[in-house]
Amino acid sequence: MTKESNDRDTVAREKRRARLLRGLDLKQSVGVEIGALCWPLVRRADAGKIIYVDHTDTPHLREKYREDPHVDANEIVEVNAVWGMNTLHEAIGGQYVDYVVASHVVEHVPDLVTWLRELAAVLKPTGEVRLAVPDRRFTFDYFRRESGLPEVLTSYVERARVPRPFCLFDHCLNAADISTAQAWRGRIDRASAKRHHTWQGALHLARDVVENGTYHDVHCWVFTPRSFANLIANLCDMDLIDFACEDFADTVRNGIEFSVVLRRSCDRQYIAESWRRMERAANDVTVGAPFSRARRKLKEMTVGSDEAAPVARVTGRKYDLDPIEPIALPPDFDPVDYLAANPDVLDAGVDPVLHYMHFGWHEGRPIHPPPAILTTERADVTGPK
């Protein structure tokens, strides 16, 4: 690689990073980045506190990617929290964070609903999730169909921990080597595209999942911006999640991804309209069709002039639209400790669980007293033996 091309890549990475993190006050925030590997969006030097989360620890990740030409194993970040069979909240020690960032991760998770709910469970009342998502139309998923509600719900009720057979079949039978530039010009020939797997290999992997529970890493879910908005809107309508779409950046020309900012809300109408707004904004003009470039530009101009769109919440600010309660109590919540840490709640005779759910979470109250006074305070709360 020449110095000039390397410089261009560096500039492109920094522009992408700035776009995905726009509005976040990294220095004053606590955040989580999932699956950073050697390309963290949030760097330790830039953040007040960043928690790197992955499915295993750093030594195992470096060993896993040692021979992968696309990953610099020596530059993989030091993982702070391992999210495996535990919940994300357990993995990060029961903390609440200002933001969660995940780049090209959401498409890999076997149970999309539970994954999103676990992200929601670690957010502060004003917290956000920033996702970068591959656009099927310009990647090796080109020939795959967009993921639908039935498959997502099936994985949810099954509590899937590994990619399900239908995901493996769709990937193995349809994933192919695709030129992004040609995809943007609409010049992909199905017959000549080189496939990643054979149907025999697909059957083998599916049987391995059913019989042995083996994890095979594939894109479980396939999206375009419009299909993503429609799917998440349906999940919100079913009260499975309560995320609104606060911001959306469509796939840029010759790019392969779109990005979405999600934030919890107590207003169901606001949530529903936010996803309808993203659906309307998403440019679904078929690439390669006659006058597609002109139609795409016209769509962009039409969306840009939509004066009826409500103003999204500003990152970090409190609004009446914000959620009323946390998804659940922190994993290490102890009523006695909470009363010891908050003597005014004890004096008021208020139920500690109800107080935390309705007030303590919003107020950022501690759930444990300082260690130096823990024993004494617990004795005061529980009374004589």
Q: Which residues does each predicted region cover?
A:
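Conserved SAM-binding loop
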Residues: 29-144, 260-264
